[in-house]
Amino acid sequence: MRIEQDLKLGFKDVLIRPKRSTLKSRSQVDLNRQFTFKHSGKTWSGVPIIAANMDSVASFEMAASLAQHNVMTAVHKHYSVEQWGEFVASQTAEVLQHVMVSSGTSDTDFIKLSEILAKSEDLNFICIDIANGYSEHLVDYVRKVRQAHPQAVISAGNVVTGDMVEELIIAGADIVKVGIGPGSVCTTRVKTGVGYPQLSAIIECADAAHGLGGQIIGDGGCSCAGDVAKAFGGGADFVMLGGMLAGHEQSGGEVVEQDGKMMVKFYGMSSQSAMDKHSGGVAKYRAAEGKTVLLPFKGSVDNTINDIMGGVRSTCTYVGAASLKELTKRTTFIRVQEQENNVYGKE
């Protein structure tokens, strides 16, 4: 047993200090990034926000909508190969280039992944996702997928420390997904006592990834546009959002009526709800590590994504960053004990 004495920080522990700026308007800020990925050699440009690979968030409808904003969607893994075929046939290359194909790590998952990728040469992104990215099995699976699909852009996770980021990049991942337990419907930290404050995880993992020419996705923990900006400021190349994009008409969640109001079911992918739906219930040897909530129906996701991007643009103007790429260099975090004045309720 050992104890690390360094304080680790989440988004609520800091604010970004403002700096002098020559920008006259938020409209001058460019949120598009261009990346050339280490192993695949592919180049992608767009707004590096990703809808999380949850079946009550990342539907085909969500992918089609967010692509119009140059934003990515990690489409959840529970669509069939046939459903993927129908989706691919109905969409343009521009939409498909903003889609990640999600995969588990079983032999069946590998076969399914290959069949989906064969549907279109415009499906370039793979999201290999398991809750515990510290498994040797994940590293072996990344190697296997890299060998089978050398031209694909592979993201893999989830992890929270630099050593495992390096391991996954060396094994063949272009991008590593960072975050254990910060999500709004994740209870891993409560059930297991395992986790890492998300901002510190992003800062440390970004340093490790960038040293090897890789990228990271900050996955989880964002509850407002300011948190998204803090994730980018901390060094995240991409930011993945679940709860912030749930509850919309494109999210795919079950709509129910409660007290005369339309509500949308949103749940973690290790929750009782998810395992009942996809695995025949919670296995006797494990515990559910997610919760199920009902969210007020939010309408179209277009309004929400515009609000998020508007907030990040505003952050950039406050620190003098003309582009999202400059935000990390212009960010100075200050530790705080308060975030906002809640006398009239939270925003």
Curated annotation (Swiss-Prot):
Q: Where does K(+) bind?
A: G181, G183
Q: Could you say which enzyme class this protein belongs to? A: oxidoreductase
Cite the entry's keywords alphabetically.
Metal-binding, NADP, Oxidoreductase, Potassium
Alphabetical list of Pfam families matching this protein = IMPDH
| Metal-binding found in the keyword field | yes
Q: List the disulfide bonds.
A: none
SMART domains, sorted: IMPDH
GO molecular function ontology, one term from the record: GMP reductase activity
Q: Name one GO cellular component term.
A: GMP reductase complex
Subunit: Homotetramer.
**What's the protein called, per UniProt?**
GMP reductase
| UniProt source species | Shewanella pealeana (strain ATCC 700345 / ANG-SQ1)
